[in-house]
Amino acid sequence: MRYWAARADDSAPPWPGTAEIDRLEFVPAGRAAARLTHPRDVDLVTAAASALGAPPDDTAPLIILRHTKASSRKRWEGPDADRPLDPKGTAQADRLSVLLACYGIDRVVSSDALRCLDTVRPYATAVRAHVEHEPRVTEDAHEKAPQGAGDAVRELLASGDAAVLCSHRPVLPTLLEALGPLPHSAFPPADVTDQTLSPGSFVVVHRRVAGGEVEVVGVERHDL
């Protein structure tokens, strides 16, 4: 079982209740701990409040995303940059749109390869966001100058924006290494930064930026 910390959305509809849960109520961490009856739950709330050190909305996510499933490289006869998603990849991109919405992403950055652009396009369209083309994270650019891909990640990390960066499998090791040391998470570090992310899978880095300094407070991984 894994837990997340998030800010309550006042515009969310009332909780309808389930067979196990009658009512949903948000209270400050201190009051929540006082109302809990199981010591392990108290420890969980205390640890979460201590780790955050500030309200969850003081952080912003940066998502490193591998494009969804593309057409076969061997069978494609045109330029590789124009290789499209296959039907499964198109369906995955639609599913990703829902997942990305959970993180409030408002900045969409992508390799200018068609398969990457089409991976993030459904989400960008849904939230009316402009898709920024980032040529430094294409496969060709990375092969010639990998430092550029790392710089692109570090710039996004320092921006403090809630952003997603979509790129390619061969580029992922450079992008993930550019994140720097990651804090303890629910995942072993090798799993979080596994360089073999499957198509459509992503790593989320939660960070806060203050005075030009970047503090990563949490990291998670989702396999599509």
What are these regions (language model features)?
Residues 217-224:
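Short, solvent-exposed aromatic-acidic interface loops
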Residues 62-63, 159-170:
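Generic beta-sheet signal
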Residues 48-58:
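Short amphipathic alpha-helices and their capping/turn segments at secondary-structure boundaries
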Residues 42, 57-145, 150, 173, ...:
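Active-site-proximal alpha-helix that buttresses catalytic centers in soluble enzyme cores
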Residues 2-4, 201-203:
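Short beta-strand micro-motifs in enzyme catalytic cores
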Residues 3-6, 14-48:
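NUDIX/MutT-family hydrolases
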Residues 28, 67, 168:
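Short, conserved phosphate/pyrophosphate- and ester-handling motifs at nucleotide-, phospho-/glycolipid
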